[in-house]
Design a protein with these regions (language model features):
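A general, composition-driven signal for non-globular sequence regions
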Residues: 3, 22-26, 141
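N-terminal secretory signal peptides that target proteins for export/translocation
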Residues: 1-8
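Core of compact, soluble alpha-helical bundle domains
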Residues: 27-153
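Bacterial N-terminal signal peptides
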Residues: 12-24
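Low-complexity, intrinsically disordered segments with a bias for serine/threonine
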Residues: 8-9, 22, 30
Length: 153
């Protein structure tokens, strides 16, 4: 009789454990934190911010010297590189295939004042599209990591 009650307890525990696993498996998994890319709104949202940012840069007399002589095609390529870099850096599916920042900005003579003005334009573009403060801060923090390779003077 004793071995039968041990068997019953083992059987009951086994069934209970199986039932618990079945129930736990049917519960939704704890939501994983969304990437910055997802929180911003994905590719189209990033593209809108980048497009606005580029319009601001190209329209600013301070940046004329950097864009003078570039063809429309060249400007489109620069835009795509910026978009791909932001997309990849925010956790999106894009792959940045451009040159490293130091190489692509070498010889341009970008100053701290240029950097600060560009950062203000980017912040204004993020504000225009109502990117929340947390996400805006993360984008600007990423861009700040590039400063040492972009600013020459």
């Amino acid at each position: 009789m004793r071995s039968s009650s041990r068997f019953e307890r083992t059987l009951v525990l086994g069934v209970a454990f199986s039932l618990l696993l079945t129930i736990a498996g049917s519960l939704p998994a704890r939501a994983q934190e969304k990437t910055l890319y997802e929180r911003i709104g994905g590719y189209n949202a990033l593209a809108a911010v980048v497009d606005d940012f580029i319009v601001r840069l190209v329209s600013d007399k301070q940046f004329e010297k950097f864009f003078a002589g570039h063809s429309t095609d060249s400007k489109k390529r620069i835009r795509q590189h910026i978009l791909d870099q932001f997309c990849a850096a925010t956790g999106g599916p894009c792959v940045y295939t451009g040159r490293d920042m130091k190489t692509s900005h070498a010889g341009l003579g970008i100053t701290d004042a240029d950097w600060d003005a560009a950062a203000k334009h980017l912040a204004a573009s993020l504000d225009k599209f109502k990117v929340p403060e947390r996400e805006k801060g993360e984008v600007l923090a990423f861009v700040t990591t590039l400063k040492k390779d972009i600013v020459e003077k």
